[in-house]
UniProtKB/Swiss-Prot annotation:
D-ribose 5-phosphate binds at D37, G166, G227, G248, S249. Pathway: Cofactor biosynthesis; pyridoxal 5'-phosphate biosynthesis. This is Pyridoxal 5'-phosphate synthase subunit PdxS. Its EC number is 4.3.3.6. The gene is pdxS. It comes from Deinococcus radiodurans (strain ATCC 13939 / DSM 20539 / JCM 16871 / CCUG 27074 / LMG 4051 / NBRC 15346 / NCIMB 9279 / VKM B-1422 / R1). Catalyzes the formation of pyridoxal 5'-phosphate from ribose 5-phosphate (RBP), glyceraldehyde 3-phosphate (G3P) and ammonia. The ammonia is provided by the PdxT subunit. Can also use ribulose 5-phosphate and dihydroxyacetone phosphate as substrates, resulting from enzyme-catalyzed isomerization of RBP and G3P, respectively. In the presence of PdxT, forms a dodecamer of heterodimers.
Amino acid sequence: MRGQPRPKLRRMTEQQTGTPQLKQGFAEMFKGGVIMDVVTADQARIAEAAGATAVMALERVPADIRKDGGVARMSDPKMIREIMAAVSIPVMAKVRIGHVVEAQILQAIGVDFIDESEVLTPADEQFHILKRDFKVPFVCGAKNLGEALRRVGEGASMIRTKGEAGTGNVVEAVRHARAVLGDIRAVQSRPAEELMTVARDLQAPYDLVQYVHAHGQLPVVNFAAGGVATPADAALMMQLGLDGVFVGSGIFKSANPERRAQAIVRAVTHFQNPDILAEVSEDLGAPMTGINIDELIPEARLASRGW
């Protein structure tokens, strides 16, 4: 329940993977939690001790990917295995958009979730991975409802806002969350006979548009990501109506990662309690410096990757 400490989520077994129902059910277990980017086993242990629901194993956090430039690819499987061995909570890892072989490799080494991520350099500018062909569940980013439903149609078990990863600036995550939730309200307001036209305009599967019309939500879990850097940022995304939060560079690029990780977990749990939010926001040390979105040239905007 929201406002209550959540039970610790464990790694999946082989028997728990495979069908869309099992994959989406596993994703539901992350609701109300925080998923943290980590680049070492020690960071993964810090995240687990802080109460993270899962960790995202990668060689460079998004802020470093931005700074270093070049082609960003799937992380070394050896590094991912080391992180998997260090913690008992689920471990996620990223693949490039459209790179089916990277996804096959991650499934083979036993990761619990794959992020088909715009943070990495896209491998295919026309097609995303057909995620339903995999036993392991996928999470994908989206800027609007049409994009979210296309990813679900391909088999994604979780959606997240794209935001602008590595900036420490939550404004784009807020924009994308409001866009998706606003589009959902707009679909709900349309009469049933107009839904085929809505599906055409959204470029989304008709049956998924029908689901949104009937239920007023996405068919899968909807998380915030991209620029979350403070407990207040995390609570803001929860108050907007999202199901949980990914935090990338915001923790381990800050002055006190342990305290900030704990504070963000508490903020997500108690996102409607200003007294607790004030308490957990105190004395955290300096956050990551951050980047103003207006300073990014179009080519540096990661959210524009994918379609």
